[in-house]
Amino acid sequence: MGFGDLKSPAGLQVLNDYLADKSYIEGYVPSQADVAVFEAVSGPPPADLCHALRWYNHIKSYEKEKASLPGVKKALGKYGPANVEDTTESGATDSKDDDDIDLFGSDDEEESEEAKRLREERLAQYESKKAKKPALVAKSSILLDVKPWDDETDMAKLEECVRSIQADGLVWGSSKLVPVGYGIKKLQIQCVVEDDKVGTDMLEEQITAFEDYVQSMDVAAFNKI
């Protein structure tokens, strides 16, 4: 298993393809699996790898919480497609000072029993909350205006990037291109969200992260269902 060399374009392409139908490396919530792969990537993937870029920006937003994310961080070869081998070079093998700080949490060998216990408790609490289904789920129908930079922006690619955003409680609907003048068209796209899971701020943050295509995003209509 693996993604090839995640520091190379080929490795990032494997990661992008892997995330085409997934929100996370493993499971349905961010975990130490995402942290392990995130650490191996040199920086934000290029805009044309919209699935990988969407995932990268999402995991980056968990920077302060990464040490407490559930799961156990494993070697890169434990993640990814089964038919691809991990060849990513680890920068930690060349030099590792005693004063180095692991921003994403301790290594498994150094992790204290107390830290393990707390992490397992958090995971159990999350699973317990997830199992309790609310009697009524509040939903909203939102119409978004997504504006490109100019008339040369690839609107098909822009829409692909927008629809690549996946989240629990988010369902994309119909869309159309609407002229705004000077040959420029904006993307008007419908979505239905669960109010306690997805907000317009989150949508705006993730959509405008595709900055090579998107100039801005506005809420054109918002209706409770």
UniProtKB/Swiss-Prot annotation:
The keyword Phosphoprotein applies. GO terms for biological process: translational elongation. Residues 1-90 form the GST C-terminal domain. The modification N6-acetyllysine is found at K7. The modification Phosphothreonine is found at T88, T93. Residues 79-98 are annotated as: Disordered. Transmembrane segments: none annotated. GO terms for cellular component: cytosol; eukaryotic translation elongation factor 1 complex. GO terms for molecular function: guanyl-nucleotide exchange factor activity; translation elongation factor activity. The modification Phosphoserine is found at S8, S42, S95, S106, S174. Catalytic subunit of the guanine nucleotide exchange factor (GEF) (eEF1B subcomplex) of the eukaryotic elongation factor 1 complex (eEF1). Stimulates the exchange of GDP for GTP on elongation factor 1A (eEF1A), probably by displacing GDP from the nucleotide binding pocket in eEF1A. Belongs to the EF-1-beta/EF-1-delta family. EF-1 is composed of 4 subunits: alpha, beta (alpha subunit of the eEF1B subcomplex), delta (beta subunit of the eEF1B subcomplex), and gamma (gamma subunit of the eEF1B subcomplex). Interacts with elongation factor EEF1A1. This is Elongation factor 1-beta. It comes from Sus scrofa (Pig). The lineage of its organism: Eukaryota, Metazoa, Chordata, Craniata, Vertebrata.
